[in-house]
């Protein structure tokens, strides 16, 4: 570290351009991930409406928690995009410095952004590879592994669930519900066609459908 070009096989300008291309590619991956999670969330919303109409309080709560997890995952992905934009700006600055000084320089901004990006599971492998290349080039210093960030996630999740369930149910049902119901008698938005409620689904099938939905969301967030 510090000796620019010590083990470099490519010119600095070529390295910076390659890093920028990889970052943009990962941004597209993140965009797809966000869209997939949001599409699945729409399905969850419809399931919450159905469960509310049937007075299935436990199902409403489980699905609301899934939505909280999904929205939290989407927020983290948007944050990762912001960090990637910071790295891209840093790469532009490196090219400007390279033209003047003839070598790459250390960047605290890039360092901070990369420290955050290597913790994002969806892009972790690529970001670790990039960080190693940037360390060799002297742009960033060696980063320590930080594995403690998500230790309190479960506890925070429970607290958030208690606070957010009512709000989410109110939001999904356009105000027809303010909290998880014990029995719903009020008309909800987008009512079922006549006769649809008469044929209630088998309980086991509903459980399987719920588990399948949870599994899909967990896969998208992983």
UniProtKB/Swiss-Prot annotation:
A lipid is attached at residue 2 (N-myristoyl glycine). Residues 200-210 have a biased composition (Acidic residues). Residues 59-64, 168-169 are annotated as: Important for autoinhibitory function. GO terms for molecular function: identical protein binding; molecular function inhibitor activity; phosphatidylcholine binding; phosphatidylinositol-4,5-bisphosphate binding; ubiquitin-specific protease binding. The record marks 216 as: Interaction with STAMBP. Belongs to the SNF7 family. Its overexpression strongly inhibits HIV-1 release. A motif (MIT-interacting motif) lies at residues 201-211. It comes from Homo sapiens. The record marks 48 as: Important for autoinhibitory function. Its main location: cytoplasm. Widely expressed. Expressed in heart, brain, placenta, lung, liver, skeletal muscle, kidney and pancreas. One of its GO terms (biological process) is protein polymerization. Residues 203-207, 221-222 are annotated as: Interaction with STAMBP. The acidic C-terminus and the basic N-termminus are thought to render the protein in a closed, soluble and inactive conformation through an autoinhibitory intramolecular interaction. The open and active conformation, which enables membrane binding and oligomerization, is achieved by interaction with other cellular binding partners, probably including other ESCRT components. Probable core component of the endosomal sorting required for transport complex III (ESCRT-III) which is involved in multivesicular bodies (MVBs) formation and sorting of endosomal cargo proteins into MVBs. MVBs contain intraluminal vesicles (ILVs) that are generated by invagination and scission from the limiting membrane of the endosome and mostly are delivered to lysosomes enabling degradation of membrane proteins, such as stimulated growth factor receptors, lysosomal enzymes and lipids. The MVB pathway appears to require the sequential function of ESCRT-O, -I,-II and -III complexes. Keywords: Apoptosis, Cell cycle, Cell division, Coiled coil, Cytoplasm, Endosome, Isopeptide bond, Lipoprotein, Membrane, Myristate, Phosphoprotein, Protein transport, Transport, Ubl conjugation. The gene is CHMP3. This is Charged multivesicular body protein 3. Residues 151-220 are annotated as: Intramolecular interaction with N-terminus. The keyword Ribosomal protein does not apply. Residues 180-222 are annotated as: Disordered. Residues 2-113 are annotated as: Intramolecular interaction with C-terminus.
């Amino acid at each position: 570290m510090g000796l620019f070009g010590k083990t470099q096989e490519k010119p600095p300008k070529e390295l910076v351009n390659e890093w920028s291309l990889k970052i943009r590619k990962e941004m597209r991956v993140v965009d797809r991930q966000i869209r997939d999670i949001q599409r699945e969330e729409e399905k969850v919303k419809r399931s919450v409406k159905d469960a509310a109409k049937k007075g299935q309080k436990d199902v409403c709560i489980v699905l609301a928690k899934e939505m909280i997890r999904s929205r939290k995952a989407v927020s983290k992905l948007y944050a990762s995009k912001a960090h990637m934009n910071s790295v891209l700006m840093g790469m532009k600055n490196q090219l400007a410095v390279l033209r003047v000084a003839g070598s790459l320089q250390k960047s605290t901004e890039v360092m901070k952004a990369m420290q955050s990006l290597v913790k994002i599971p969806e892009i972790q492998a690529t970001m670790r590879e990039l960080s190693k290349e940037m360390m060799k080039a002297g742009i960033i210093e060696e980063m320590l592994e930080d594995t403690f960030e998500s230790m309190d996630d479960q506890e925070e999740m429970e607290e958030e669930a208690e606070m957010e369930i009512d709000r989410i149910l109110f939001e999904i049902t356009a105000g027809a519900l303010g909290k998880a119901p014990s029995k719903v008698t009020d008309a909800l938005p987008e009512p079922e066609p006549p006769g649809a409620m008469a044929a209630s689904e088998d309980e086991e099938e509903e459980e399987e459908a719920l588990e399948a939905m949870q599994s899909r969301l967990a896969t998208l967030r992983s």
